[in-house]
Amino acid sequence: MIASHAILLGVNIDHVATLRQARGTRYPDPIQAAIEAEQAGADGITLHLREDRRHIQERDVALLRDVLVSKMNLEMAVTGEMLAIAEKYCPEDCCLVPERREELTTEGGLNVTGQLARITEACVRLKEAGTRVSLFIDADPRQVEAAAQANAPVIEIHTGHFADARDERNRRKEFQRIVEAVKRGREVGLQVNAGHGLNYQNVAAIAALSDIVELNIGHAIIARALFTGMQSAVGEMKRLMREARE
C-alpha cells in the first residue's frame, strides 16, 4: 500500500488557543499560528469549535475565514448550534466528531451506526451549504459502511488507539485495523483521511498507507513548535510524511 503520490497535512491549531485560554489573554494567537503553518507547507488548517468553547472561539473561526490561503477543516459536534455556525461560515471541510464535556480530547470515533438518520441529515445540510463533510470514526468496517450510507464523501480514521498502544503486539493489531478500515473505505467510494495522536515517531507508518489522502495533526506539532518554532515543526512533519511515500 505504499505509493509515491503526495499526502496532505492539515495542522490543528486548537492547542495554541488552549494556551491562550489558560490565562484569558489575547496571545498566543491561533490565527498567527495558522498563517505560519501555511507558510511552512500546511495544506489546510483544522480547528475544533467545542460546545464548551474550551479553546477555539467562534471569533477565531470568523477571523480564519478571512485570512486562510489553503482550506479550513472545522471539527464540531452534531448539534443544531454547530450546524448553524458551519452554515454561517461555510468552511471548505467540516469533520463531525463525538463530544463529551468531561473528556480531555476526543476519545473515540463517531457512532454513525447508532445515529444514522441524524448524521445523514447533518450531511445533507452541510452539503447544501457548500461544505464537504467528513466523519471521524473508529477503524471499524461497520462504521465505514454506515458513513457511506449517510452520504458523507470523506471519513477520518481515528488513529488514537494505534498511537496509544503500550506494546508492539497491540500496536500491530491496531495498525491492521486501520489498514482494513482504509481498504473498506476505498471499496465503498470514500476519501480516507486519518488523525489523532500522531506524532514525529509514529506518523511514518500511517503516512505510508497509499490510500490515505490527508493526515490531521495538532498536539505534537504545537508541542514541537514551543521549542523549534511553528514553521520548523510543520516542515519537519511534512518531511516525515513525504519520505514515508517515497
UniProtKB/Swiss-Prot annotation:
It catalyses: 3-amino-2-oxopropyl phosphate + 1-deoxy-D-xylulose 5-phosphate = pyridoxine 5'-phosphate + phosphate + 2 H2O + H(+). The record marks E156 as: Transition state stabilizer. The active site is at H48, E75, H196. Pathway: Cofactor biosynthesis; pyridoxine 5'-phosphate biosynthesis; pyridoxine 5'-phosphate from D-erythrose 4-phosphate: step 5/5. GO terms for biological process: pyridoxine biosynthetic process. 1-deoxy-D-xylulose 5-phosphate binds at D14, H15, R50, H55, T105. Its EC number is 2.6.99.2. Signal peptide: none annotated. It is found in: Cytoplasm. The keyword Disulfide bond does not apply. Keywords: Cytoplasm, Pyridoxine biosynthesis, Transferase. The keyword Kinase does not apply. Coiled coil: none annotated. 3-amino-2-oxopropyl phosphate binds at N12, R23, G197, G218, H219. GO terms for molecular function: pyridoxine 5'-phosphate synthase activity. PANTHER family: PYRIDOXINE 5'-PHOSPHATE SYNTHASE. Belongs to the PNP synthase family. Catalyzes the complicated ring closure reaction between the two acyclic compounds 1-deoxy-D-xylulose-5-phosphate (DXP) and 3-amino-2-oxopropyl phosphate (1-amino-acetone-3-phosphate or AAP) to form pyridoxine 5'-phosphate (PNP) and inorganic phosphate. Homooctamer; tetramer of dimers. This is Pyridoxine 5'-phosphate synthase. The gene is pdxJ.
